[in-house]
From Swiss-Prot:
Hexamer formed by 3 homodimers. It comes from Sus scrofa. Belongs to the NadC/ModD family. Keywords: Glycosyltransferase, Nucleotide-binding, Pyridine nucleotide biosynthesis, Transferase. This is Nicotinate-nucleotide pyrophosphorylase [carboxylating].
Length: 299
């Protein structure tokens, strides 16, 4: 999907609510430094100072809309950033522009970091000739999930289930609580009715076969070493060819190619949201009639 079109997935009211909550977290009361800057009309340039994938424009826009500033973009969503890149310009009252600065930069750095990691993972997987889905997980930052899931999509990965309601996923603890794989899948099928798929986390071929026999749509082979993963997936597919197979647990950008194989449909990586390095952005004010520069001016 074109990254520019992904903004349509984000409800405007949700964007505004998130932006408002982030700004209130940073400034819940008085803003003393506003008396230093004043309210004169000002402009600043957003610079990208590290390579990666640009992601998070709708959230950036929403943050500055909350503080009465306007953003003009020079690069589209999903752009490959080559530092130092001039990404956007922000205009508005000085105290408002600086009120939104750090919140907007934090969000953009994090979202772009996730997108960059996702893009690297997808490129790595495709380089092996594998055509399955590279996915994130539900291992996201509380209160920041929408940003991170959106970043995955911009990077070309799939977001996996957005929340508990997107898929009935039976994990190891659910199996213990239900009294076994078959009982857990039966309960999951009742909960899923016709609208949701059921996925079961399995730690052995025996569990995987039991889950598929009980009616699971997908089987998650968790924490399998590659040399165990592929024979297990092949044996499962031989008996249940329509069951989807997901590999997860211990997958990194370095060892990802080892998990790609003809019987694996999905590979999910928690590190895409948990360990992706943030990109480096800065927002620099400049005086009317001067040339914007990406670093602090020297006197």
């Amino acid at each position: 999907m074109d990254p520019e079109g992904l903004a349509l997935l984000l409800p405007p009211a949700t964007l505004a609510t998130l932006a408002d909550s982030w700004l209130r977290e940073d400034c819940p009361g008085l803003n003393p430094v506003a008396l230093v800057t004043g309210a004169a009309p000002s402009q600043a340039v957003l610079w990208a100072k590290s390579p990666g994938v640009l992601a998070g424009r709708p959230f950036f826009d929403a943050i500055f809309a909350q503080v009465n500033c306007q953003v003009s973009w020079f690069l589209p969503e999903g752009s490959k950033l080559v530092p130092v890149a001039k990404v956007a310009e922000v205009q508005g009252p000085a105290h408002c522009l600086l009120l939104g600065e750090r919140v907007a930069l934090n969000m953009l750095a994090r979202c772009s970091g996730v997108a960059s990691a996702a893009a690297t993972a997808v490129e790595t997987a495709r380089g092996t000739g594998w055509a399955g889905h590279v996915a994130g997980t539900r291992k996201t930052t509380p209160g920041f999930r929408l940003v991170e899931k959106y970043g995955l999509l911009v990077g070309g990965a799939t977001s996996h289930r957005y929340d508990l309601g997107g898929l009935v996923m039976v994990k190891d603890n659910h199996v213990v609580a239900a009294g076994g794989v078959e009982q857990a899948v039966q309960g999951a099928r009742r909960a899923a009715n016709f609208a949701l798929k059921v996925e079961v986390e399995c730690s052995s071929l025996q569990e995987a076969l039991e889950a598929a026999e009980a009616g699971a749509d997908l089987v998650l082979l968790d924490n399998f070493r590659p040399e165990e993963l592929h024979p297990t997936a092949a044996a499962l597919k031989a008996q249940f060819p329509t069951v989807g197979v997901e590999a997860s647990g211990g997958v990194t950008l370095d060892n990802l190619p080892q998990f790609c194989g003809p019987h694996i449909d999905v590979i999910s990586l928690g590190m895409l949201t948990q360990a992706a390095p943030a990109l480096d952005f800065s927002l620099k004010l400049f005086a009317e009639g001067t040339t914007p520069v990406p670093y602090a001016r020297k006197s």
